[in-house]
Amino acid sequence: MWILVSWLALVARLVAGTQCPDGQFCPVACCLDQGGANYSCCNPLLDTWPIITSRRLDGSCQIRDHCPDGYSCLLTVSGTSSCCPFSEGVSCDDGQHCCPRGFHCSADGKSCSQISDSLLGAVQCPGSQFECPDSATCCIMIDGSWGCCPMPQASCCEDRVHCCPHGASCDLVHTRCISPTGTHPLLKKFPAQRTNRAVASFSVVCPDAKTQCPDDSTCCELPTGKYGCCPMPNAICCSDHLHCCPQDTVCDLIQSKCISKDYTTDLMTKLPGYPVNEVKCDLEVSCPDGYTCCRLNTGAWGCCPFTKAVCCEDHIHCCPAGFQCHTETGTCELGVLQVPWMKKVTASLSLPDPQILKNDVPCDDFSSCPSNNTCCRLSSGDWGCCPMPEAVCCLDHQHCCPQGFKCMDEGYCQKGDRMVAGLEKMPVRQTTLLQHGDIGCDQHTSCPVGQTCCPSLKGSWACCQLPHAVCCEDRQHCCPAGYTCNVKARTCEKDAGSVQPSMDLTFGSKVGNVECGAGHFCHDNQSCCKDSQGGWACCPYVKGVCCRDGRHCCPIGFHCSAKGTKCLRKKTPRWDILLRDPAPRPLL
């Protein structure tokens, strides 16, 4: 039975807090422990939740056997492991205390509150994905998620941050709750707990907008160029693209350790990312799950990081649902509440890219590996793909190692004193001629394969003669992918690097609009090039530059690299050579 201390003092000093007889300070009230010897912080407004004092973590450990009997070995938020004086403990967010299993740590980590199944989950929030403790009220938070007001049948304030007791109204101007009995300070909501029936939340969207990671994790690039998940927030991604370290540490790849001033821990291996559940903007473009499609000032789609967001008229920013865009202050407003508005990010293609095989790594004339892979022979004699560029193919014909490593026995890779696990090769895909089809701008218009739909001055669509191009804001010009439009200088600019991949040639057909010779033709918006066999092939650029290897070509204004796999910029490209077709072609 919990004995409440100084209830009258609690009511009078709800905001100021309460000092317990033993000298400790509690934000709401003090409760005498069951033994009657010690005090703990409690909150009578949340009914009478059992609260006990937490214990300090003591001693480092790797496994439970390193701790005394009755202790557990816990991973802390700092990435270290320490012994907890509970047989089944839970690490607190302060990294210094722990609580028994079945208890939740307080914000300062000094007390533990028991939230058993009989208490937690009594209040189900709409959708049955989140729940609040008994005698609490579900309220929407500012980010659209569910929060809990620590009072039964509470009034949720329209700022989505605060709440008031039942029967009271929110006075956000004076930050008070108004009731017939007087005024009270506004109460602040806390996040709702995900129910046991709810699926794990994946709120961390990676920069490629195609991969997502679980809550409290960090996106890190893998050797394949894709993204994986480091299982802790704000982690440090190591340069080997295989490991990661806790925040405020340094990757020591030679010793395979994470180093900080206070401690050393082992490197962590990244986990694969998860595909994003996409929100379709149109037939070709999509945004990550939980985002909203909004038009950018270029006419292209952008993604706002809110569900059911409000797209601002400047075509750059967006606001949470229910808010209004205030362009003068650069804020989102809801009543007296103001929050900074968010900037949209470019949406990504959601349908298979017609150029998907263009960047493949060719193994021979019939087989290829994805971009940033290496062709390696399998034990069958066929080609396999190692999921990293310029990799070392191991003699067992099963594994491969990163560049600079040596293949060791049992599938390991070694570089100096460092050992990592080898990667298994994947099957190649057979190279086939792409089906030629137009790129749809909308339901009524399209552009040829290898070009990009851009909005025109007339409000309709026009075609840029480059794939995945950047549409300039003047709606008359476009630039290659990776460049920005400089409207005043009338140039396409790139801060660093002036390289783009070259394009593979396709076989010339017997019919077409551009005559090559010897009865061979290429389609409109293509160029004729001699292939490696001396015949004719088609380059998907207008006035394209044919590479010496007879397999690739580059846009006008570029020249081919020595191997023909890259296009090097001669000088800053002027956009007067990148004019688009006056009108797109209708879909058939």
Curated annotation (Swiss-Prot):
Keywords: Cytokine, Disulfide bond, Glycoprotein, Lysosome, Repeat, Secreted, Signal
Coiled coil: none
Keyword Signal among record annotations: yes
Pfam families according to UniProt: Granulin
GO cellular component labels: cerebellar climbing fiber to Purkinje cell synapse; endoplasmic reticulum; extracellular region; extracellular space; glutamatergic synapse; Golgi apparatus; late endosome; lysosomal membrane
Sugar attachment sites: N38, N372, N525
GO MF term (any one): cytokine activity
GO BP term (any one): positive regulation of cell population proliferation
Expression sites by tissue: Ubiquitous; most abundant in the spleen and several tissues of endocrine significance.
Signal peptide span: 1-17
Source species, domain of life: Eukaryota
InterPro entries associated with the record: Granulin (IPR000118), Granulin_fam (IPR039036), Granulin_sf (IPR037277)
Cysteine disulfide links: C125-C138, C132-C148, C281-C293, C287-C303, C294-C311, C304-C318, C312-C325, C319-C332, C363-C375, C369-C385, C394-C407, C401-C413
PTM characteristics: Cleaved by ELANE; proteolysis is blocked by SLPI and is concentration- and time-dependent and induces CXCL8/IL-8 production; granulin-3 and granulin-4 are resistant to ELANE. Cleaved by CTSL in lysosome thus regulating the maturation and turnover of progranulin within the lysosome.
Cellular compartments annotated: Secreted; Lysosome
PROSITE patterns: GRANULINS
Family according to the record: Belongs to the granulin family.
Subunit structure: Progranulin is secreted as a homodimer. Interacts with SLPI; interaction protects progranulin from proteolysis. Interacts (via region corresponding to granulin-7 peptide) with CTSD; stabilizes CTSD and increases its proteolytic activity. Interacts (via region corresponding to granulin-7 peptide) with SORT1; this interaction mediates endocytosis and lysosome delivery of progranulin; interaction occurs at the neuronal cell surface in a stressed nervous system. Interacts with PSAP; facilitates lysosomal delivery of progranulin from the extracellular space and the biosynthetic pathway.
Function: Secreted protein that acts as a key regulator of lysosomal function and as a growth factor involved in inflammation, wound healing and cell proliferation. Regulates protein trafficking to lysosomes, and also the activity of lysosomal enzymes. Also facilitates the acidification of lysosomes, causing degradation of mature CTSD by CTSB. In addition, functions as a wound-related growth factor that acts directly on dermal fibroblasts and endothelial cells to promote division, migration and the formation of capillary-like tubule structures.
Protein name: Progranulin
Organism: Rattus norvegicus
